[in-house]
Amino acid sequence: MRLHEVSGATETVEAAPAKINLALHVTGQRADGYHLLETLVTFTAAGDMIRIRDAATDSFSISGPFGDLLSAGDSGDNLVTRARDILRDALASTGQPARPVDIHLEKNLPVASGIGGGSADAAATLRGLLRHWDAAIAPEKLKSLALKLGADVPMCLASRPLIARGIGEDIEALTDLPELSMVLANPLKAVSTPEIFRRLQNKVNPHLPTPSTIGWATTGWMDFLAQSRNDLQPPAQALLPEIGEITGLLSEEGATLVRMSGSGATCFGIFHSFDAAKNAETSLRKKRPGWYFHATRTI
């Protein structure tokens, strides 16, 4: 999957890959209330898309299967327009022009579903606008802007396998995570992230081990992942029992590892091949026609 491309002379296209928390350990809580996390993250070919064109004035529009769930009103509430504005202000402080743009979001991922949709869209907007405006910004400054938009935005800015610690600002790239075939599954019901954290009984849990990955094959990674967990899954499932139903369905289809991503409600099942994942997607769509299922690969 190519993260970005230029379509024609005036349109910049930037992919916003889905973020998958293969493991998520809650290891503490700061005095300001933010929870400390350690998470192993990868990204998939499935995702949203950002398209940018020059315009007389700024504008923003949304399409896609989940576009109706978001407002295109340019009020600053959407992370895409917030990313545009915060980047423009940062560039203005260094004397770099940032001309008006029309930004179009193709919303292919379920909204508020634990796979970083909004954060990925914001990160893609930052990447795309820097290319569209032919602008430059120091990496640490860009990371700081991303963190202001949300804890997941810095990792989505990278859009590559990584381990993130703290509230998401401490990122360690992973160079040898193999390609994984998986099915993403969501019952298309919302689950409250704040309520999940309120119901989390243990705020200090065992740390995520640092994988010693030199020479690991896919089986080594799967063994490692099997020993990890998502600490948010039990309270999320208590709030939304369909999460347990999803994981059961994925297991029945032959997934070798099943887990919830982020704070849910999206779950993933890893399969031994993409063909197996596609077959599982077809079967699951028949079993639960009103739910979201998508076979994809990691990038």
From Swiss-Prot:
Catalytic activity reported: 4-CDP-2-C-methyl-D-erythritol + ATP = 4-CDP-2-C-methyl-D-erythritol 2-phosphate + ADP + H(+)
Gene Ontology molecular-function annotations: 4-(cytidine 5'-diphospho)-2-C-methyl-D-erythritol kinase activity; ATP binding
Active site: K19, D152
GO BP, sorted A to Z: isopentenyl diphosphate biosynthetic process, methylerythritol 4-phosphate pathway; terpenoid biosynthetic process
Keyword Kinase: yes
Record keywords, A-Z: ATP-binding, Isoprene biosynthesis, Kinase, Nucleotide-binding, Transferase
Superkingdom: Bacteria
Pfam family, any one: GHMP_kinases_N
UniProt gene name: ispE
Keyword presence, Kinase: yes
Lineage, broadest ranks: Bacteria, Pseudomonadati, Pseudomonadota, Alphaproteobacteria, Hyphomicrobiales
EC number: 2.7.1.148
Residues reported to bind ATP: P110, V111, A112, S113, G114, I115, G116, G117, G118, S119, A120
Segments traversing the membrane: none
InterPro entries xref list: GHMP_kinase_C_dom (IPR013750), GHMP_kinase_C_sf (IPR036554), GHMP_kinase_N_dom (IPR006204), IspE (IPR004424), Ribosomal_Su5_D2-typ_SF (IPR020568), Ribsml_uS5_D2-typ_fold_subgr (IPR014721)
PANTHER family in the record: 4-DIPHOSPHOCYTIDYL-2-C-METHYL-D-ERYTHRITOL KINASE, CHLOROPLASTIC
Protein name per the record: 4-diphosphocytidyl-2-C-methyl-D-erythritol kinase
Family that this chain belongs to: Belongs to the GHMP kinase family. IspE subfamily.
Function noted in UniProt: Catalyzes the phosphorylation of the position 2 hydroxy group of 4-diphosphocytidyl-2C-methyl-D-erythritol.
Pathway: Isoprenoid biosynthesis; isopentenyl diphosphate biosynthesis via DXP pathway; isopentenyl diphosphate from 1-deoxy-D-xylulose 5-phosphate: step 3/6
